[in-house]
Amino acid sequence: VHIATLAGIILILLVIVLAARGCGKISHRTPEGVVEGYIKAAAAGKNKKMQSCYSADKLSDEAKTEISSTIKYFQAHGVKDVNIDSCGSISENKNYTYVYIRYNLVLENEQEYPCISTYLVKVQDKKYYLYAPSEISDKISQQAAKDYQKFMTTKTYTDYTKAYEVFLKKNPGYEDKIAGKLNG
């Protein structure tokens, strides 16, 4: 009995150690991994982790602004946590993968605010990174707009819009409240 208990304790400690080692790191192994890591870091207000999602040693001012704006946006909502619903590829070619992420911001009152975001992801040295805004050409931007238009007809997107509308009906004036926090 004692050996079984000891083995159980060792197993639990091993699981805790392995889980702790994997927590909080940004995965650069897949386009979706870097996007999920970026959103989780934003929800936690982790500026440095968000910066690590970009490949540049020196981040452009646009990328820094995007990071700080995203953190400010999440803070305006009073985010406690983020629940990722789905994350996948909208389109891909040899230069980039266009990734969507559908997630809910868990608010202080335990309600979940539906969100959807898209990111362009590139591969560099066999790792995936977000495109900095300054790296996105007009050609890429135009193609992404066409791809997004198609994405808007998918079940993922229509489910998001329905969830968003339900949230707003339950919380009239919510958008104005957030806009006031962001502009004030």
Question: For each predicted feature, which ranges?
Answer:
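Sec-exported extracytoplasmic/periplasmic mature domains
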Residues: 39-43, 55-59, 107
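Low-complexity, intrinsically disordered terminal/linker segments enriched in charged
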Residues: 130-184
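Short, aromatic-enriched amphipathic alpha-helices that serve as compact interaction elements
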Residues: 27-49, 163, 170
